[in-house]
């Protein structure tokens, strides 16, 4: 990633996705549970950021990763490293994202909920002397008329319900 960052001229960011539904993860060969995956992500980001910053060789001995004299010959072009984006609002996700990410990605939920999340995330980031940026993602449903848009919305909701129900 640091090499790509140098090649494309400081336009790279990395969005960290820890995973989704356990069944989907197992399909990809990842049999860790939800909270374990976030502990692994925390370790991975700790190691990756230290390699990118490249202050010299370091050792790391964690639950999931162990490195000795880790170092890269290539540092990130961006300082201190490639910007990290992160998403996830579970109890396991919030501390990891607040500790490591530069921009926290949230969905455009009711504004009160977004405000509560941002307050909590800011408090968590402050524990690490960090300030977060935010990306708020909205998914507009557009149609020729308001009634047609609501019809599309109901169809999307029914599709989600059908996909998420046990078969």
Give the ranges of each region predicted by the language model:
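Active-site-adjacent structural elements that line small-molecule/cofactor binding pockets in enzymes
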Residues: 1-167
């Amino acid at each position: 990633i640091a090499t790509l960052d140098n090649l494309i001229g400081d336009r790279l960011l990395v969005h960290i996705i820890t995973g989704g539904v356990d069944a989907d993860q197992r399909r990809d060969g990842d049999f860790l549970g939800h909270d374990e995956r976030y502990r692994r992500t925390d370790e991975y980001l700790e190691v990756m950021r230290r390699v990118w910053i490249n202050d010299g060789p370091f050792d790391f001995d964690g639950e999931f990763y162990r490195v000795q004299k880790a170092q890269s010959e290539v540092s990130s072009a961006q300082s201190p490293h490639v910007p990290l984006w992160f998403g996830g609002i579970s109890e396991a996700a919030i501390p990891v994202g607040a500790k490591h990410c530069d921009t926290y990605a949230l969905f455009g939920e009711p504004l009160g909920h977004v405000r509560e999340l941002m307050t909590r995330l800011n408090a968590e980031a402050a524990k690490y002397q960090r300030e977060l940026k935010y990306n708020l993602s909205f998914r507009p449903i557009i149609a020729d008329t308001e009634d047609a848009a609501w019809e599309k919305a109901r169809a999307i909701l029914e599709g989600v319900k059908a996909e998420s129900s046990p078969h």
